[in-house]
Amino acid sequence: NIVSTLKEATIKDLDDNFISLDNFEYKKDTNIFKSVGKILLKDKNQNSYEFSQIYINEKKKEIIGSNAKAFLNQEDFKIDKKNKPRIFSNTINLKENDTKFIKSAFTICNYRENDKCPPWELLASEIRHNKKNKTVYYDNAIIKIYDIPIFYLPFLAHPDPSVKRRSGFLNPSFSDTKNLGASINLPYFWAIDND
């Protein structure tokens, strides 16, 4: 009850995800899919993920991958049209209502010479996105600007970009001027009323 190939293949699953890979093995009795090599997954929201190894459990609707690169093109994740949010991670665990990135780096900057965004990244031992309560959590977060650690936070949480109104920190902004040098602005929004 095993379906496998050692040739390049593209697969579309029941959730409209497309997976391009070098090889795969699928066990029909357990509904477990695995692959090692160059793997590209594109979901129905046009987010793309690259892996070197992937396991998919169809019964649990769970994807576990290693050496992951997530390029988030979904409008909910973008602060504005210029940003290209991405997360690089040792391990990723995608579930229906919860996504975990282990040993991760997150940024929205392009890292190009002419890019107006200073190269910054947020490193964390774990990043969790709870889709049900629309919150992103970070454990052991380090904010780096130009590869220099600026802040360490043992725990950080904020609403995901799809949330229109909730008390909490807003998206940080970074600037760099010749007179003042690099700076960070981290505004806090206080929702006095639920309306």
Question: Could you say what each language-model-derived stretch is?
Answer:
Residues 1-195:
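Structural signature for solvent-exposed beta-strand/loop edge elements and short helix-capping sites
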